[in-house]
Design a protein with these regions (language model features):
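Threonine/glycine-rich low-complexity segments that form extended coil/beta-edge repetitive scaffolds
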Residues: 58-68, 73-75, 82-84, 94, ...
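Catalytic or ion-translocation cores adjacent to nucleophile or general acid/base/metal-coordination motifs
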Residues: 618-657
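Beta-strand initiation motifs
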Residues: 92-96, 285-288, 509-510, 577-578, ...
Length: 986
């Protein structure tokens, strides 16, 4: 049998449920709590950094992220009963929500999370309830008493001018018969005046003259009939009852605010419009002009209680949740005086390292809230401590006789020298040459000649500690409010800052407080109808081409361009490009378009059995050019919003027991989208009952949460280079049930439930914390703990001579293993797994704790919970060629496996072979012959050998990393024997 050696080039292929014989190199049977990375390999996922308990969060709530910018990030929750709560995502502090009207609470009442949707457009946060049927309002344009008017167009002598009302009563005036003297000049005012006087003499009618026009109505306001004849031509006198057939027939002088309909074609009312008279001098009657208006008595508004509501951030930092009606807008608060706005901050004490210019952080403490600071300059802090040979800190030279050497007739003893480093009475390292010793950011070096102290040979040492990245200048990026001068605030690393000056300022509230769902101001129910969503629920709220977009059933409705709150036309005389769009999608099956993604081709709309594209084939998007075209008829679960991963879109199709995840690429509106099932190699891996799916494009990571496994996030990561993609599926097991998660760029925010507490945490997917964390060979590495805290509260008890290292309020969880990590440079990397302790009498935030000996209130610690990462490899087969073909007939016998790692801490390898006990090999990641006390147990590049001695398909091989340190597996080499019995494969 031939000895062979083969390499598995990486382990980032993710989980595959295909038979091991069909798996590609790099694919795994299982992968939990690892994060595949093309640069680093299979890395242990970052830990969750605990932010805060979310005060007053409720069970079974519906959560949404509101990320306005880097400074203002919020997490909101609606209870099923409609109550709203808001917290800062940066600090976890609950924000003030002003009193909410009962109708707004009712609007947000819901039974399942998918019934609610939010949409953030700059300063607006819209809230949609998909179950609420939109209704027309009750505000109607003012009714108008039936009236008519008669216009005297020409005057003539010897003529009769007759007005007949209700086909029965006539009023006439006869002009003089001649123009010979002494007859006066004929004037239209005489005709108008005499006819008005004649009509007003009848108790049933009222008339008024203005210019050459006579206004007529019934005294009791009832309707009536009107006609007029006279003059010496057919058009000498004309009568109109409430409407005209041409704008040319409108009088040049009339009474202010009276309305007349201008009729279009006789067989349709769709081209009619209404006009209102405006006097030039704003008096009650006179010359003026006509402008387009709303018909009398027409309902103008939408019922705001049934329309989407809005969350508004007020000037004083509070939030208002309300309906968008006229009364609320006009009654909203105007400018308000905000006090305690921070204008200057000074550094009080900055000792932590690892900070970088541009780093931003929330300032904790003080009387106010929402203060954020930025690092503008950093410096390096260097401190040295020297000690003499006869002190408790020294280097000791030991020698051991190892033999003799002979030179000529001289024989001399040969010694091996070792150098033992002692600091404050504790051995911290051993080396063979006495060269300076580096532990963390401290360098220990000999500072004098060796001398005999007792029976030892010693020299003094100097310990030089260099802390890089100490904050030396800061600026304010978010001033906050409610602070007072002399307030002390801090960052999470324990650096402190003093607020030196504050001021007060009158600030306007958010502009959205002045907006409301606009009224219909033009036309009538036929010419300017209610939007097609009236009478039905709104299924989706989105944004496209500077318009708010609603969908309702198969209809797509867009607001006016630039006027997000207006769904009525600005004129009915012509079609204006900025007017609303209201079109219907043509489908064979009923459809509800519940999700949308903006694409270069248009607005991609998703229904449960079809995908549509709202677009235009011209440059301008308008009522005349807008189209909704069918792209595909792929089936999907419409409870879960599809996501945009940059070059394509991902959506979910749920089965009874498992879910399928599809990717769809849209190239143009004339080409059918290409669809690929991403879960084809693992058909039963993703559970059904999906509740949320989110994506981080910057980290190339998709995450899915299911009701069936509430502690687990299923993730898909991809790396795209041109047309080539490396991708894989894997699972993250969270410390407790996940209530909510979302991405903000490469930051994952997670809310987990621990007992009755809801805890907000964050995870940085691409970079480790640039301060506070462990320093390894000049690189900061975060601890691999969940709910970890780099600056826990420390309380010393002199009676027990113990220091309590406390978990934050709400972070206690007896189902998890607490870990205490020491961060001081001389002991960095030392950690203890302890039992969680409880003191009911302690202050809030100090009730749950771990302990260390002595008074260590000035020492640095990290505290958190242990989590385990594990990956199981498939069976080992001989790979015959570069294409990955496996010889599944002739199974090799594996002698040993060599695991290559990078920047990795301790881990263990487990071999489960048929017919023998499990073999577990602990790999501590400590270099031989180089002892550094309490040094971080991480090796930059390492290869560990695990003995196997089993056939490639008769054992399981699993890698487990449960230490609080980073672990990254780059590749696998295996050695063994292989015999193909002389048969050559074709």
């Amino acid at each position: 049998m031939a000895a062979i050696s083969q390499k598995i080039g990486n382990l980032i292929g993710g989980v595959s449920q295909q038979p091991d014989t069909n798996k590609f190199n790099g694919q795994l049977r299982s992968c939990d709590n690892f994060y595949p990375d093309t640069a680093l390999g299979l890395t242990k996922r970052p830990g969750l950094r605990g932010i805060s308990k979310l005060a007053n969060a409720v069970a079974d709530g519906t959560w949404f992220p509101i990320f306005r910018d880097d400074q203002e990030k919020y997490i909101i929750q609606f209870s099923k009963a409609g109550a709203l709560k808001i917290w800062s995502a940066n600090s976890g502090l609950q924000q003030t929500v002003n009193a909410v009207a009962a109708e707004s609470i009712t609007y947000a009442t819901h039974k399942s999370a998918d019934e609610l949707q939010t949409l953030q457009i700059n300063d607006y946060i819209f809230v949609l309830n998909r179950t609420k049927t939109v209704e027309a309002g009750t505000a109607a344009a003012a009714a108008q008493t039936p009236f008519g008017f008669v216009t005297i167009n020409t005057v003539a002598y010897s003529s009769n001018y007759t007005i007949t009302l209700d086909n029965a009563t006539s009023f006439s005036y006869a002009t003089p018969v001649t123009t010979a003297p002494p007859q006066a000049q004929l004037n239209v005012n005489d005709i108008v005046g005499n006819l008005v006087s004649s009509i007003n003499a009848n108790a049933n009618y009222y008339a008024a003259g203005i210019g050459n026009t006579i206004y007529i109505s019934r005294i009791n306001g009832a309707n009536f009939a009107l006609s007029a004849v006279g003059g010496n031509a057919g058009t000498s006198i004309t009568a109109f009852k409430g409407s005209v057939t041409s704008a040319a027939q409108l009088p040049k002088s009339f009474f202010k605010d009276w309305k007349i309909k201008v009729e279009g074609t006789t067989d349709s009312g769709t081209d009619d419009y209404w006009v209102k008279f405006i006097t030039s001098d704003n008096t009650s009657a006179g010359a003026g002009f006509w402008e387009e208006t709303i018909a009398p008595g027409v309902i103008q508004d939408l019922n705001a209680t049934t329309m989407p509501h809005v969350i508004i951030r007020e000037a004083n930092g509070t939030f208002t949740y309300r309906q968008l009606d006229l009364a609320s807008a006009t009654g909203s608060a105007g400018p308000s005086t905000v006090t305690g706005i921070v204008t200057a901050v000074a550094i009080s004490s900055a000792t932590s390292g690892g900070h970088v210019v541009g780093e931003q952080f929330a300032a904790n403490g003080g009387t106010g809230n929402n203060l954020r600071l930025q690092v503008d300059r950093v410096t390096n802090s260097v401190s040295s401590v020297s000690s003499a040979a006869n002190s408790s800190s020294y280097i000791r030279q030991d020698r051991t006789l190892i033999g003799y050497t002979t030179a000529g007739r001289t024989t001399s003893p040969a010694y091996r020298y070792t150098y033992v480093w002692i600091f404050n009475g504790q051995q911290i390292g051993v080396n063979s040459n006495g060269a300076p010793l580096t532990i963390g950011n401290t360098v220990y070096q000999q500072n004098g000649a060796y001398q005999t102290i007792g029976n030892e040979l010693r020299a003094g040492i100097t310990a030089t500690t260099t802390i890089n990245g100490v904050i030396s200048a800061i600026s304010i990026v978010q001033a906050g409010q409610g602070y007072t001068a002399t307030n002390t605030v801090s960052n999470s690393a324990g650096d402190t800052f003093t607020i030196t000056t504050v001021n007060a300022a009158p600030l306007e509230g958010d502009a959205s407080r002045l907006n409301f769902w606009k009224y219909r101001e033009i036309g009538d129910a036929t010419t300017n109808p209610m939007p097609s969503f009236v009478g039905y629920p709104v299924d989706l709220i989105s944004f496209y081409k500077n318009r708010i977009v609603f969908t309702s059933r198969q209809n797509v409705i867009c607001s006016q361009a630039g006027d997000y709150f207006n769904f009525f036309a600005s004129t009915v005389i012509t079609i204006v490009d900025s007017d609303p769009v209201d079109i219907s999608a043509s489908t064979l099956k009923p459809i509800r378009l519940k999700h949308a993604i903006s694409t270069p081709q248009g607005l991609l709309l998703f229904g449960d059995n079809a995908q549509m594209l709202l677009s235009t084939t011209t440059e301008a998007f308008s009522p005349k050019t807008a189209e909704v075209n069918l792209l595909s008829t792929l089936s999907q679960t419409d409870r879960i919003a599809p996501v945009d991963i940059g070059s394509s879109y991902i959506f979910v199709e749920e089965g009874v027991k498992a879910s399928s995840i599809y990717e769809m690429a849209v190239t143009d509106i004339n080409t059918k989208p290409q669809s690929t099932e991403l879960t084809r190699p693992l058909p039963s891996y993703i559970p059904s009952a999906i509740v949320d799916m989110q994506v981080s494009q910057s980290a190339g990571t998709l995450a899915i949460l299911s009701k069936q496994e509430t502690r687990n996030l299923y993730l898909y990561r991809w790396f795209q280079l041109g047309d080539n993609r490396v991708s894989g599926w894997f699972r993250w097991i969270m410390p407790s049930d996940v209530e909510f998660f979302t991405f903000d760029h490469d930051i994952l925010f997670v809310v987990t439930k621990h007992g009755s507490n809801y805890v907000l945490s964050r995870m940085s997917l691409l970079t480790d914390t640039p301060a506070e964390s462990l320093l390894f060979e000049g690189q900061y590495l975060d601890v691999r703990l969940d709910l970890f805290d780099y600056n826990p509260t420390r309380v010393y008890n002199s009676g027990t001579d113990l220091t309590r290292i406390c978990f934050k309020d709400g972070f206690e969880d007896t189902n998890l293993q607490p870990v205490l990590m020491f961060l001081n440079a001389d002991v960095a990397g030392y950690f203890e797994e302890q039992t969680l302790q409880y003191d009911a009498a302690a202050a809030v935030g100090q009730k749950y704790f771990l302990t260390v000996d002595g008074n260590q209130t000035t020492s640095k610690f990290a505290i958190g919970y242990k989590y385990e990462a594990s990956a199981q490899l498939p069976a080992f087969y001989f790979v015959k060629d570069d294409r990955g073909g496996k010889d599944t007939l002739n199974i090799p016998r594996v002698s040993r496996i060599k695991v290559n790692s990078y920047n990795s801490g301790p881990y263990r390898a487990v071999i489960r072979a048929e017919g023998r006990d499990d073999f577990v090999l602990e790999l501590p990641q400590v270099n031989a012959d180089n002892y550094l006390a309490n040094n971080i147990p991480i090796i930059r590049n390492a290869q560990s050998t695990i003995p196997v001695m089993a056939k490639g398909n008769q054992f399981e091989f699993e890698l487990i990393a449960d230490s609080p340190f980073q672990t990254a597996f780059t590749s696998i080499d295996w050695e063994g024997t292989y015999n193909n019995k002389g048969i050559q494969s074709l």
